[in-house]
Amino acid sequence: MTQLEWRTIFANNLLCILREKGMSQSQLARDSGLSVSRISEYINMISTPTIFAIINIAYALDMDVNELVDFDSRIV
């Protein structure tokens, strides 16, 4: 899997989860300790999240990291 493919799948998962939870990017940024611009970069596939960011996002979404990066479970 290429880095671009990984970013695409992660972004799609994140968007789907945000919709499921009725959560905005701003709320996720606040709850995860990341900036709104950083969350936007992940969703728009501009940058690849660090493991630190993935852990913080998963915690903010009240889910296991594995659920967040499960590349077979969600389709937007």
List the predicted regions and their residue ranges.
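A short, Lys/Arg-rich alpha-helix, primarily the initiator
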Residues: 1-23
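Short alpha-helical elements of helix-turn-helix
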Residues: 11-12, 37, 51-54
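Residue-level detection of the helix-turn-helix DNA-binding "recognition helix"
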Residues: 19, 33, 44, 73
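DNA major-groove recognition helix of helix-turn-helix
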Residues: 43, 61, 69-72
